[in-house]
Structure formats: C-alpha cells, structure tokens
C-alpha cells in the first residue's frame, strides 16, 4: 500500500499527493499497467478525505500519468519515454538585461516629456466616465484599425490642426510607431529598398532590418534628405521627418517636398513615409503643412504619435494610409488585433473630441516655449560666444549646441557621464561610417530640471573647455 508523509506541505493536500505519486511514476517505482488503490482505500491509509485522493488522481489522469477503466479501477500509464530531469534547487541565469535608466543622471538627451504637466485629473475623469458609459464596448474586441470614435477624433484633429482631409477609415491605430513600422513592411513588402535619413534614429532602420527589409541610410544636405541619393540607392520607400528632423532640426522647404513627390510619382511602387513626430511644438508662426496635404497621387503614408504631445508612456500612435493601401491593409492584414486597449482608445477619443487635447497642446507649447527661452538664456550666461554656438530651429523640443573644444566627441560624452551628465553628440546618430567630430551636441530640454540647468552647464564648461 502506498504511504506518503503529507504533513510537511504548506499547500493543498491533493497537490502534495499528486507530486508524490508523479515522482514515483517518473522514477519507475510505480510500473506501467500497475493497478492503483481505490480512492477510498488510499484515503483511509493516508488519513485524508476521499476528495483529496480524487483530485490528485484527476490531475494525474489529465496529465497522462494514469488512466481509469470503468468498473476496474485506476492504472499507471506507460510513461517510459519520459526522462527524469532533476531541476537544480537554484540556478543563476545568464540573461543580460539592458541597463535601467539612472534617474540621478542629468540627461540632456532624453526625449521624455515633462510629466508634471500631464492632465491627470481630466484623464482620470474621462476614464471613469468611459468605464461607466461604455461597459459593453470596453469588453468587446476592438476593430483591427482602432475603434471608430478614436479614428473620427483623430481625423477631425488632423483637419483642424494640420489641414489634412482624411477619412477615418484611412487611419490605423497602434501601440507605438515601432509597431506601425512593422505593419508597413508587411503591407509594402520586403522586396523593396527602404531608405532612411542619415543622421537619424537608429531604431527605425533596426526595425526595418528586423522585419527582413533592406534598409539604406541616405545622407542629408541643408534642405533634408537628398533626392539624388535616394535615386542612386534605387530605393522605393523613403522614410523622412520633414517638419522637424532629428537630430539636425532641419525643416524641409517646400521645393524639396515637391521634388520628393515627383520622385515618388515616377513609379507605382514608390512611397513616402512621413513621420510627423514632434510637429505640434512649433514655437513661432503656424504649423508647417505636411507633405500629405500637397500629395495629389496618394504617395504619402503619414505617421504620428501621442507620446510626445501627451506623455512618453501613452503608447498610442496612428498612420494615415492612401485609400488603395487602406483597402489592401484590411484585405491582407485585418487578422492583426489592434494593440491599444479599448479603455485607452475611448478615453483618448473623448479627450480629443471634447477639446481637452487642443487646450493641452496650447498650454504645453507655451510651457515649452518659456522653458526653451530659459535654457537658451542660461547657456548665454554661462558661455561666451566664442566658446559655444547654439544652432536652433523654431520647432521641436530640442536644439543643437556646438562647443569650441579640442576634445573628441566620444571623450566629451565619457567625461561628462562620469560627472553625472549625459550629453550626446550628433555623430552618435550617424548611420553610415562616422564622420569627423563636429563638436555638436543635442540639448533635449523637454524633461530637464530648469532649476539645475546653470549648475550642470558650469560643470560642462569646466570639464571640456
């Protein structure tokens, strides 16, 4: 008769009994075809309830260690193919995780937004109301392109803010632009050559390459990406950020925009991916119209995100597809689920449609404008003109500062990091072979502490000049 000590377990008795019997089967102590005691007999022998034995037997039968024969009882199954592998009590895993953000570092390179200005009370109010009013919709599966209400709100916002006349059905919502880039590769094909701006975000080319697409960096001139070099690369897809390029800050003039459209119109398989990231924060004058607004031949795919205008952790982005590509998307890729929760989609839809988003943008534009001037004033106070030069543009939340130093860019970065300051050179964003040091560094001011800026600038001055 089977005998086990079940008194040393902290969990349910049936689990302990199940483990004991399973171990005996795995180690060959109970042979294939051997008959097991009845539930009542084993329960009486172990001093437990019949239901405890029944639950243990059911678990073993469910996993294939035992089987039952009507009116004959329970038997051990043939588990001879199972290899007994003893798991170590403790094992040190060698998984190397990326380093976490060091919050003590004064980071001039971070593109995070100023979290202190997020409208928490309004967002919480809208989310509570959404949960109260939309119980059924919240628990329903979202359409693959996003809920209708959010797509309509985005279309209305694009019409009033960017002068774009788009149908809500052209809009595809996703959790972050990285996800949308991956969808675009699947939609446009891996047989195309994708070109990206150089210098630029390395992540964009990494995403294309991870999706098995050929991606080539194309050099920029003072007007943006070079159309002549796009032609030499034999590219079909041009991924650009014409409104405010990162990191150079270049705003593409209208003649270059028409030149790009002319290139795209030369072949049916050519498209422009217009990344309008950071376009909301133009400090002077009216926002520059996107290329899509002057596209008459459906050659532009427009992409934008709410991670800069609201907060970095709101992973809601969207793209606007030409009509024929929207049809192709729904025909071939509609099996993809929308990656944004319905809770966030309905809340953001109301945040936009009820005017809160426009008010927030206006308030943040004023806030960042003042912060920009404060940072520029601090730089002017800390550095004579001969020691540094600010290269700025009227839009976006960063500018470039050029130091008169003999130190290599890499050395500057390393020395300052040792003193708790993170500063990134423009050469850090070169996608092709690095050029000679330019001593130009990015000042991303959206999330820096303005009260500490003077102290940090003086440390920079003492370290590299």
Regions found by a protein language model. Name each.
Residues 1-128, 139, 324, 334-341, ...:
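N-terminal basic, amphipathic alpha-helical segments
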Residues 79, 187, 207, 284, ...:
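Residue-level signal for well-ordered alpha-helical positions
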Residues 113, 243-245, 308:
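Short glycine-rich anion-binding loops that position phosphate/pyrophosphate groups of nucleotides
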Residues 127, 137-269, 280, 286-294, ...:
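Conserved core of the PLP fold type I
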Residues 154, 198-207, 260, 271, ...:
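A generic "structured core" feature
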Residues 270, 300, 387-388, 421:
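Short, conserved active-site loop motifs that form the nucleotide-linked donor/cofactor pocket
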Residues 275-276:
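Walker B catalytic acidic pair
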Residues 296-366:
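Conserved core segment of the aminotransferase class I/II
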């Amino acid at each position: 008769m089977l005998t086990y000590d079940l008194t040393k377990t902290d969990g349910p008795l049936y689990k302990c009994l199940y483990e004991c019997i399973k171990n005996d089967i795995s180690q060959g102590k109970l042979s294939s075809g051997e008959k097991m005691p009845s539930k009542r007999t084993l329960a009486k022998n172990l001093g437990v309830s019949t239901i405890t034995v029944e639950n243990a037997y059911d678990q073993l039968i469910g996993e294939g260690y035992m089987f039952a024969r009507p009116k004959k009882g329970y038997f051990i199954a043939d588990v001879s193919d199972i290899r007994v592998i003893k798991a170590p009590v403790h094992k040190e895993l060698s998984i190397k995780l990326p380093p976490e953000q060091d919050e003590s570092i004064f980071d001039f390179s971070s593109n995070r937004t100023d979290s202190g200005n997020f409208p928490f009370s309004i967002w919480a109010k809208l989310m509570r109301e959404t949960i109260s009013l939309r119980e059924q919709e919240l628990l329903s599966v979202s359409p693959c392109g996003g809920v209708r209400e959010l797509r309509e709100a985005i279309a209305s916002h694009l019409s009033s803010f960017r002068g774009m006349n788009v149908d809500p059905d052209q809009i595809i919502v996703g959790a972050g632009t990285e996800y949308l880039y991956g969808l675009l590769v699947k939609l446009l094909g891996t047989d195309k050559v994708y070109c990206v701006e150089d210098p630029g975000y390395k992540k964009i080319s990494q995403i294309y390459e991870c999706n098995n697409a050929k991606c080539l960096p194309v050099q920029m001139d003072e007007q943006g990406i070079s159309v002549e070099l796009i032609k030499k690369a034999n590219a079909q897809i041009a991924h650009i950020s014409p409104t405010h390029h990162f990191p150079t800050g270049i705003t593409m003039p209208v003649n270059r925009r028409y030149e790009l459209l002319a290139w795209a119109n030369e072949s049916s398989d050519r498209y422009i991916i217009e990344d309008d990231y950071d376009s909301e924060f133009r400090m002077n004058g009216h926002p520059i119209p996107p290329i899509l607004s002057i596209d008459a031949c459906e050659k532009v795919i427009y992409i934008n995100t709410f991670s800069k205008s609201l907060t970095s952790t709101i992973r809601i982005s969207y793209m606007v597809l030409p009509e024929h590509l929207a049809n192709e998307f729904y025909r071939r890729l509609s099996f993809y689920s929308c990656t944004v929760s319905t809770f966030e989609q309905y809340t953001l839809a109301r945040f936009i449609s009820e005017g809160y988003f426009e008010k927030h943008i206006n308030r943040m534009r004023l806030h960042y404008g003042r912060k920009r001037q404060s940072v520029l004033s601090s730089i002017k106070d800390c550095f004579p003109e001969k020691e540094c030069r600010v290269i700025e543009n009227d839009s976006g939340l960063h500018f470039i500062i050029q130091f008169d130093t003999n130190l290599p860019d890499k050395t500057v970065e390393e020395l300052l990091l040792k003193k708790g300051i993170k500063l990134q050179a423009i050469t850090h964003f070169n996608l092709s072979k690095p050029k000679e040091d330019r001593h130009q560094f990015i000042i991303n001011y959206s999330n820096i502490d303005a009260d500490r800026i003077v102290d940090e600038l003086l440390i920079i001055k003492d370290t590299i000049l």
